Design a protein with these regions (language model features):
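Glycine-rich phosphate/diphosphate-binding loop of Rossmann-like nucleotide-binding domains
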Residues: 193-196, 201-315
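Conserved active-site and cofactor/substrate-binding residues in soluble primary-metabolism enzymes
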Residues: 2, 16, 20-23, 27, ...
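N-terminal cap/recognition module
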Residues: 71-112
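Adenosine-phosphate binding glycine-rich loop
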Residues: 2-24, 220, 322, 335-453
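Structured beta-strand/loop patches that form or line metal/cofactor-binding pockets in enzymes
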Residues: 42-71
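Rossmann-like adenosine-cofactor binding region
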Residues: 264-367, 372
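Glycine/serine-rich phosphate-binding loop and adjoining beta1-alpha1 elements at the start
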Residues: 96, 115-229
Length: 453
């Protein structure tokens, strides 16, 4: 039995009740086989795979808080500090009813390699709670965040573990948590990222994931002698990632004609009006039918069910899934290929199913997964950490310029890794495997240099 298979068997026995974590580990280790086989004796002797698949520590704690009716509520909080071989733990805090230990471990494991890809000195971790912020008052949100941070603050710090926002955790929640950390610890430090601009946040953080996605997409296309200007893009989602991906695509000369939310999707053949989309989603916080009502050229389509991914039925050269997990399935992939799609680059985390990914790659589509393509968000979080450490605030242009350089370097690194190990599929480099290998090699080199720890 190969070393990879031995470790997968061990991981499956230890984590049988955590399907998301098992899926992530299996996918990553399978893609790393050529790299691991080339160094098997060294990795086996140092138990590299056993160590890299086991978190440094897993924290689970009670979060009691009082709702507006005076009733005490209890949620469960998590922080998985997965690996700090190349820097302090770094990863978001997810607030959603679906959160459990397995999901946090899966996200933390993936974060290790994503953070490594950024070229910046940050390790991987993830946290959150099964608390649902939807429908809660500001006072209830504050009560939860303060209780959550009262426990979490014992385990984090600017040089130890620096959490950030994620699903359910925006600027409001980060502010409440930062205030509670400062109150309890008596220390003003860059312990969280995604902060407001008045207390240590970074310019361009809001735009970072969407902009970064387009910087990498453009680097990918240039490497294949394809000009992004004039290309039609299909985009899913209507949140920060989608909005700023559309904005940057338009700045680069492409035209985005779709976007979507949980109830429906827009087709606008004249190109999505970013200013109107921002007004609808960020100011009015309305559904996309409000966009269509204000835009004569736009068509609004109500989603028939959760599996209605109509944006992918529109003919496009570039597909940018920026909404949620498993939103682009095999049927969607077949439609995209039939319509002549050139590239699919992921703005969301795992938006493309395994079957769809395989189909796209085997049919010659340039495919870059979210681990590399949406790393702009965490890269800019690390730039926020740098600014906090220096007690400086960089201009938007400085941050954006550094982000562009980081995303272009990420593309170069994953392309190089795929070529070094002859990882190809459908006549193109396997950028998914390349991302895993490039991220893995940096972490492992640091682990080997630091001994058994």
């Amino acid at each position: 039995m190969s070393y990879v298979d031995e470790v997968l068997e061990i991981v499956q026995k230890k984590n049988a009740d955590q399907p998301e974590f098992l899926q992530a580990v299996t996918e990553v280790l399978d893609s790393l086989r050529p790299c691991i086989e080339a160094n098997e004796e060294l990795y086996r002797k140092n138990a590299i795979l056993e160590r890299i698949t086991e978190p440094d520590r897993q924290l689970m704690f009670r979060v009691p808080w009082v709702d507006d009716n005076g009733q005490v509520q209890v949620n469960r909080g998590f922080r998985v500090q997965f690996n700090n071989a190349i820097g302090p733990y770094k990863g978001g805090l997810r607030l959603h009813p679906s959160v459990n230990l397995g999901i946090i471990k899966f996200l933390g494991f993936e974060q290790v390699f994503k953070n490594s890809l950024t070229t910046l000195p940050i390790g991987g971790g993830k946290g959150g709670s099964d608390f649902d912020p939807k429908g809660k008052s500001d006072r209830e949100i504050m009560a939860f965040c303060q209780s959550f941070m009262t426990e979490l603050c014992k385990y984090i710090g600017a040089d130890v573990d620096v959490p950030a926002g994620d699903i359910g955790t925006g600027a409001r929640e980060i502010g409440f948590m930062f205030g509670q950390f400062k109150r309890i610890r008596g220390s003003y430090e860059g312990v969280l990222t995604g902060k407001g601009l008045t207390y240590g946040g970074s310019l361009a953080r809001t735009e970072a994931t969407g902009y970064g996605l387009l910087y990498l997409t453009n680097a990918l296309l240039k490497d294949h002698d394809i000009d992004i200007a004039g290309k039609t893009c299909a985009v899913s989602g209507a949140g920060n990632v989608a909005i700023y991906a559309i904005q940057k695509a338009h700045q680069l000369g492409a035209k985005c004609v779709t976007c979507s939310d949980s109830t429906g999707w827009i087709y606008d053949p004249e190109g999505i009006d970013v200013a109107l989309l921002k007004e609808v989603k960020e100011v009015k916080r309305a559904r996309l039918d409000a966009y269509a009502a204000a835009r004569p050229s736009a068509e609004y389509h109500v989603k028939k069910d959760a599996n209605d991914h109509g944006v992918w039925s529109i003919k496009c050269a570039l597909a940018l899934p920026c909404a949620t997990q498993n939103e682009l399935n095999l049927d969607d992939a077949k439609m995209l290929v039939a319509n002549g799609v050139i590239s699919v680059t992921e703005g969301a985390n795992m938006p493309t199913t395994l079957e769809a990914t395989k189909y796209l790659q085997e049919n010659g589509v340039l495919f870059v997964g979210g681990k590399a393509a949406n790393a702009g968000g965490v890269a800019t979080s690390a730039l926020e950490m740098s600014q906090n450490s220096e007690r400086l605030s960089w201009t938007f242009e400085e941050v954006d310029g550094k982000l562009k350089g980081i995303m272009e370097t990420i593309y170069a690194n994953i392309s190089d890794a795929a070529k070094r190990y002859n990882m190809t599929v459908g006549g193109n480099a396997d950028y998914v495997a390349g991302a895993n290998i490039a991220g893995f090699e940096k972490v492992v080199d640091a682990m080997l240099a630091q001994g058994v720890c």
